[in-house]
Regions:
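Conserved small-residue
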Residues: 7, 61, 82, 126, ...
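Acidic, glycine-rich active-site loops and adjacent beta-strand->loop/helix elements
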Residues: 86-88, 142-145, 169-174, 235-240, ...
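Condensing-enzyme catalytic core mediating Claisen C-C bond formation in acyl metabolism
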Residues: 1-18, 26-27, 188-266, 272-273
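Active-site pocket-shaping loop/turn-to-helix segments
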Residues: 42-62, 109-118, 136-150, 197-210, ...
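Internal metal/ion-chelating core segments
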Residues: 140-214
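ACP-dependent fatty acid/polyketide chain-elongation machinery
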Residues: 1-46, 68, 220-234, 322-336, ...
């Protein structure tokens, strides 16, 4: 609810972080601390094996499980799968190097070090904590990872290989270490992120965690527990650019969106909202705007929230699914509060708060390496 209220108010969650003193830009998301005291909840080994942003993940997962009325007994006795989008553990890796240099002896490292420095640290730790018996997997696909994690979950459920999938997006918070190399590309905004704006000059990284729980609409558990379905995952599409590692390709982004629409059994005219990737970079936003304009002769509402949330990178796709569900729940669209002027007149960018009850929201998450993901969240 707090997230919904802040987004509807157009409240910007970015700040200048003094810890990032060597960066070209110190603008990043302001992420509060995790809610629970996990020292009293987890075993000592579980606590030590978890990377720092894993505690944000635990907050998100436990809240999602509670809302979906998923019990500990259900997790232990059913074929539940876990898919995590995560692509770095920089803080823990930097800490590892610091200790080895200081001690000149890797035998002094705690045995837990290995398990919080792997990209798969979140999924392997959660699989143990939650007693997962289905697939446990980490997807590393840069900023498209969250969308691909959702798509893979859909494939698992459609093929009836699992009863439920817990999908998580996890992103190290914008601390001293985790975004140094990204910042070196010169794509971070020094002052204000303007998705699709004429004055856009870059993105601002953010982090934390998001979680959604997917299960078939005919699930017996949903009926027995009287669990309301918030929304339906109706389609997934993907593509790859096959070009330079940092260069967006509007045609392949178009392919990704069209695949998702086809997979959902819809036509273009039935999409009434596009929740755009739109990070605020000059090239990236232009490519996505061109792709959207090419697909839709009459442009649907385009929502771009990263001027408020920052770009949550590895968790972005999953947080978009949460945002789409919020818009269904409240019947109101988020607006590009920080964008001063729309650079693309044909793009129906939502610039002011708008009451609107959507039926199908197309979400985009694109990443380095030219990996593109699109998925559709539909009203139930």
């Amino acid at each position: 609810r707090e997230v919904a209220l802040n987004l509807y108010k157009g409240k910007c969650g970015l700040h200048h972080n003094e810890d990032r003193w060597a960066y070209i830009s110190d603008l990043c998301g302001k992420v509060p601390s995790w809610k629970e005291d996990y020292l009293s909840i987890l075993t000592h080994a579980q606590y030590k094996c978890m990377p720092a942003h894993g505690f944000f993940v635990l907050d998100a997962v436990f809240e999602a499980l509670k809302k979906a009325k998923v019990s500990k007994e259900f997790l232990e006795n059913h074929n539940v799968s876990l898919i995590v989008s995560n692509d770095s553990e920089c803080y823990e890796s930097a800490d590892l190097v610091k200790h080895v240099k200081s001690d000149a002896d890797n035998r002094q490292l705690p045995v837990t070090t290995l398990f919080n420095t792997l990209n798969s640290a979140i999924s392997m730790n959660l699989a143990s904590i939650l007693h997962i018996h289905g697939l446990s997997l980490t997807v590393s696909a840069a900023c498209a990872g969250g969308g691909h994690a959702i798509g893979l979950a859909k494939m698992l459920l459609d093929s009836k290989q699992t009863e439920m999938v817990i999908v998580i997006g996890a992103q190290e918070c914008a601390s001293r270490y985790c975004m140094e190399a990204f910042d070196a590309l010169g794509v971070f905004s020094p002052d204000n992120v303007q998705p699709f704006g004429k004055g856009r000059n870059g993105l601002a990284p953010s982090g934390g965690a998001a979680c959604i729980i997917l299960e078939p609409s005919d699930s017996l558990r949903l009926k027995e527990e009287k669990v309301p379905s918030f929304a339906s995952l109706s389609g997934y599409g993907f593509s790859s650019n096959g070009k330079a590692i940092t260069t967006p390709d509007s045609y392949q982004e178009e392919v990704s969106m069209l695949k998702a629409i086809e997979n959902a059994g819809l036509d273009e005219g039935m999409i009434d909202v596009v929740l755009a990737h739109a990070t605020g970079t000059p090239m990236g936003d232009e490519a996505e705007a061109k792709a959207i304009e090419s697909i839709f002769p009459i442009c649907p509402n385009v929502v771009a929230t990263k001027g408020m949330t920052g770009h949550e990178c590895w968790m972005a796709g999953v947080s978009q699914a949460v945002q789409a569900t919020i818009m269904f729940t409240y019947g109101r669209l988020f607006h590009a509060a920080t964008t001063e002027e729309n650079a693309f007149p044909k793009l129906n960018l939502v610039m002011r708060p708008k009451w609107y009850s959507p039926h199908h929201i197309l979400c985009n998450a694109f990443g380095f390496g030219g990996t593109n993901s699109s998925f559709i969240i539909s009203k139930v």
